[in-house]
């Protein structure tokens, strides 16, 4: 087979022509030419030449392979229609045999505004010219059969061309280097894996991946070769908000993710990388792609495979285009569940669809799930970059223009419940984001303690595409809000919770790991100066995937009359390692009698990797770490300092290279006490 890419095109629109190279959209090409249009109409054509010589004409088969078109389009060669694109199917192979002639042949991909939004019409990937004598691989279908600790991988190939004169060989390589071979007779065959290495979601095990290579041999040369990465796992619907992965009931914990939808595949992949990496760092094990959201790129699924993040896709229908897309992605172990939303789906249809998509679970819902979210302001760095200084107040035109419906009202109410009245917009941004993190934490807590019976441990949403006051955990510039840092704790494999009713504190734990935990529950009552009033330690055992009550204690008499001065610190220790640590105030933060801290700070490191060590002489609640003019991602933030023992936090600079001396100069610290 001979393969040639077509990357360079001319956009023909409005009587003008503009040079462009894949990836592109109508909007991106016009913007590069200095033309800004809010609404585009009519027909836009992307044209290129296909040169054919005598050697090419000697080939028996000539196909165009088109990928990366997410809107309806029509493909022409020399003004002859050779195929239509529906924008749903990931790959199209159009037969151009008998149409192409010696010399230059005009290729035209046409988008009509009556079928799509021209702003986003374009190509994310190059068009390929495929010339071959016998056959090439069109599609690879795989089914996993798990039985008695082994896996049978059934492989089925669809061909373009004459498959009778080719033979196929499959090679499977495990992450440990073990190799399996199989011949595929007439494109069909199986590989028996006696000692499989399973793919596990994040927090439950290793994300083992296999590499499958399929070579198609003709009479003389290799006609085609396809490489696929896959994971071995089972997936089934569990109770409540759970999925059963490899026989283990797993609570879905994460956020709704709305892909950027940028037609520039490079930009889209960069944003997908940032989003999935951020989710993994914050202990997410799932992302929900909501109904109507742009389709993620292939890179997104690759990243979720590597990081162990389960993907749930919502669909209102499973038409041929959607099924083709799901087939194309069925090798990804991360794509575990399809939520089919609609009242008209019949059980027989579900059974039929499950047979078509054997590596995914299918759940039918009457209505689209709703996930809790509470709005907060973007990072103040983001606000300062776009909002004029004289407009930096909550009720200014610039700030109100960023707000989603009801956002400011909801923020005011949530801040009023917990915090002192903020003195300025920066303080309000800090308080509103903390309030959002705490409210979401309550929803996650209920889900975890009920083992998913109260619903998934999922909030709305991970990311913003545009500047807005929203419920997102990461703003449009990629800056983490408190809810993203709190997610490190919300979604940790083991979390500890404390609730007090009438002076009685109940400690409960949630475990989302496959091993039991034997350790100690330690708690203490302390004052604002971190002096211990009372302390106790009890031995505890937490079973795998359980949410037990660990201990109850009546502290009403100890804190009576001094609720504004005392707080509760509690933790679980496994050996010498602190698995989970939290604090609880007995009154809202606005009523607690904080003392002014004296903080000692040391920053060490170089280039982009640093650590900050902080110590305080008094209790500090939700200490925010940030730098003026420098972006960083911390392994932990919004810290509670409960003793004079130093706390060390590693962090990574996301911009250029820095020095510890400069970072010390631009360090910004604030806590809840600074709101008063």
Language-model region placement:
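Secreted/periplasmic carbohydrate-active enzymes, especially glycoside hydrolases
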Residues: 1-298, 303-307, 320-327, 336-337, ...
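A cross-domain feature marking catalytic cores of carbohydrate-active enzymes
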Residues: 254-259, 291, 313-315, 340-342, ...
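Short acidic/His/Gly/Ser-rich catalytic and metal-binding motifs that mark active-site loops
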Residues: 263, 313, 467
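Substrate-binding clefts and catalytic carboxylate motifs of secreted carbohydrate-active enzymes
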Residues: 11-13, 69, 368-517
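Structural detector of well-ordered beta-strand residues that form the stable sheet scaffold
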Residues: 108, 287-288, 310-312, 361-365, ...
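Active-site region of glycoside hydrolase catalytic domains
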Residues: 138-140, 288, 322-400
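Short, internal active-site loops enriched in acidic
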Residues: 236, 343-344, 462-466
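Beta-strand-loop-alpha-helix segment that lines the small-molecule cofactor/substrate pocket
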Residues: 308-318
């Amino acid at each position: 087979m001979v393969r040639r890419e077509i990357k360079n095109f001319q956009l023909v629109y409005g009587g003008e022509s503009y040079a462009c190279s894949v990836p592109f959209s109508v909007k991106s090409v016009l913007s590069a030419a200095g033309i800004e249009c809010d609404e585009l109409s009519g027909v836009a054509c992307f044209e290129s030449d296909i040169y054919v010589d005598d050697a090419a004409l000697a080939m028996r088969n000539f196909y165009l392979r088109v990928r990366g078109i997410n809107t309806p389009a029509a493909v022409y060669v020399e003004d002859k229609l050779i195929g239509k694109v529906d924008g749903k199917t990931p790959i199209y192979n159009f037969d151009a045999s008998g149409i192409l002639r010696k010399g230059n042949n005009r290729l035209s991909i046409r988008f009509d505004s009556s079928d799509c939004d021209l702003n986003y019409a374009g190509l994310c990937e190059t068009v390929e010219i495929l010339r071959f004598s016998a056959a090439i691989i069109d599609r690879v279908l795989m089914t996993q059969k798990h039985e008695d600790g082994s896996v049978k991988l059934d492989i089925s190939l669809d061909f373009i061309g004459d498959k009778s004169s080719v033979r196929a060989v499959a090679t499977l390589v495990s992450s440990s280097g073990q190799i399996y071979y199989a011949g595929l007779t007439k494109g069909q065959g199986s590989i028996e894996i006696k000692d499989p290495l399973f793919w596990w979601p994040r927090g439950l095990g290793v994300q083992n991946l296999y590499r499958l290579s399929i070579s198609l041999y003709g009479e003389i040369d290799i006609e085609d070769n396809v490489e696929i990465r896959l994971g071995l796992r089972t997936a089934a619907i569990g109770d409540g908000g759970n999925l059963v992965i490899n026989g283990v009931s797993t609570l879905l914990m994460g956020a709704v993710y709305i892909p950027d939808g940028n037609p520039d595949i490079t930009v889209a992949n960069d944003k997908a990388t940032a989003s999935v990496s951020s989710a993994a760092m914050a202990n997410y094990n799932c992302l929900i792609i909501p109904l109507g959201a742009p389709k993620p790129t292939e890179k997104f699924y690759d990243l979720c495979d590597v990081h162990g993040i389960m993907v749930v896709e919502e669909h209102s229908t499973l038409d041929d285009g959607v099924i083709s897309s799901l087939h194309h992605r069925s090798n990804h172990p991360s794509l575990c569940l399809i939520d089919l939303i609609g009242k008209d789906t019949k059980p027989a249809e579900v059974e039929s669809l499950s047979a078509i998509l054997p590596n995914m679970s299918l759940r039918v819902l009457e209505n689209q799930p709703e996930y809790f979210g509470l709005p907060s302001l973007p990072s103040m760095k983001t606000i300062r970059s776009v909002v004029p200084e004289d407009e930096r107040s909550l009720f200014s035109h610039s700030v109100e223009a960023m707000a989603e419906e009801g956002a400011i009202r909801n923020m005011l109410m949530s801040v009023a419940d917990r915090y002192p009245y903020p003195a300025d917009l920066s303080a309000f941004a800090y308080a509103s984001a903390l309030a959002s993190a705490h409210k979401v934490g309550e929803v996650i807590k209920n889900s975890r303690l009920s083992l998913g019976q109260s619903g998934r441990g999922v909030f709305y949403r991970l990311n913003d595409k545009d500047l807005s006051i929203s419920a997102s955990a990461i703003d449009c510039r990629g800056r983490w809000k408190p809810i993203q840092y709190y997610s490190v704790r919300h979604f940790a494999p083991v979390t500890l919770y404390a609730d007090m009713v009438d002076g009685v504190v109940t400690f409960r734990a949630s475990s989302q790991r496959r091993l039991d935990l034997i350790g100690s529950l330690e708690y203490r009552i302390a004052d604002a100066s971190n002096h211990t009033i009372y302390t106790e330690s009890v031995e505890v055992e937490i079973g795998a995937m359980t949410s037990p009550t660990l201990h109850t204690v009546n502290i009403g008499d100890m804190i009576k009359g001094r609720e504004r001065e005392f707080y509760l610190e509690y933790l679980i220790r496994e050996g010498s390692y602190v698995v989970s640590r939290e604090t609880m105030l007995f009154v809202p933060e606005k009523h607690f009698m904080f003392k002014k801290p004296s903080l000692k700070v040391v920053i060490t490191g170089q280039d982009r990797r640093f650590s900050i060590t902080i110590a305080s002489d008094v209790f500090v609640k939700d200490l925010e770490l940030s730098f003026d003019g420098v972006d960083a991602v911390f392994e932990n933030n919004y810290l509670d300092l409960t003793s004079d023992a130093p706390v060390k936090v590693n962090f990574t600079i996301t911009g250029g290279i820095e020095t510890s001396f400069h970072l010390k100069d631009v360090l910004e610290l604030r806590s809840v006490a600074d709101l008063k």
